[in-house]
């Protein structure tokens, strides 16, 4: 069994100062006026954001917040994997691995972990407690870098070993949005003897036969039309990620603008105001994880890796994920959910919840709604641990 080592995040002072200096020196006078958020990240907001970054943002405070949880490092398949492991309250907390996506990080779940692990501290029942495992994806954040692009299926294999061989869980639940939804799907598909159930708040997988019937075909047409506008970043990162990285690795402002555009465009905002949902500290801390670890490059590799793994099709034979699956359907999800009839052909859907609000970053946007749905799903599993 591989060694598990306690890990404390500490970014050198000189790294923080270098980042601030680069942000402060950005040549704003060379930026043309823009059209709000229509052409990309809003110029006026970007200036305000960077002024806050340089004069008010406190990385040390946010770093300490991450370190409040039990952080660890281990090695799986010769890749260092960083993870938070918060053991739940009570006699029988259910093991739960939560995977982030891009452009997310473990920061998405900082307001989420304690609520899941210790519900009795927040007005809930100890019977709903989870052992919460939140890893940094390979190539992301504080985890090590794979030798070449890894897709979500390979990452699922790594996380399966993390949960079973490293942490010793016989059975566990997997949850995720964005790439975390794909990773959770592969955990349920490839590792059903250990992954007892999955809960997803995005549909990234596709059935080999495509949409059937008028309702599904109409969804597919709307989806493809929307992706003409939304797909630019994905095409770049899935084909030539290295080229983009030369610019981003040299520009903290560039990384911030690239990520902020997605946080703005993929979220359920009030009057288009990004700070109606997120604080500047939340946004900056998520961005800073990419910058201080210099992982913008390798984090984008996952898009290339999925292409090499065969894309979105779950099974060329038309098989589905047979472990019980919970689906939290948020209305402003970037990848609009298809009709349930389509999802039923890919997953054994045990719970389907159409949410009243929320978008792509559900754990940050609507943590209470997502947590309630995860708890309900786990309660309704017939037995725990389920028989393999």
Regions found by a protein language model. Name each.
Residues 115-122, 166-219:
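Conserved hydrolase catalytic core segment
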Residues 147-166:
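Alpha/beta-hydrolase active-site loop
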Residues 102-114:
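The serine-hydrolase catalytic nucleophile loop
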Residues 93-101:
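Short beta-strand element of the alpha/beta-hydrolase
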Residues 1-8, 12-17, 22-23, 27, ...:
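Alpha/beta-hydrolase
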Residues 237-388:
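C-terminal subdomain of alpha/beta-hydrolase-fold enzymes, centered on the catalytic histidine
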Residues 59-61, 122-124, 133, 137-150, ...:
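Glycine-rich "HGGG/HGxG" loop immediately N-terminal to the catalytic nucleophile
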Residues 14-88, 92, 282, 291-313:
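Non-catalytic accessory segments flanking enzyme active sites
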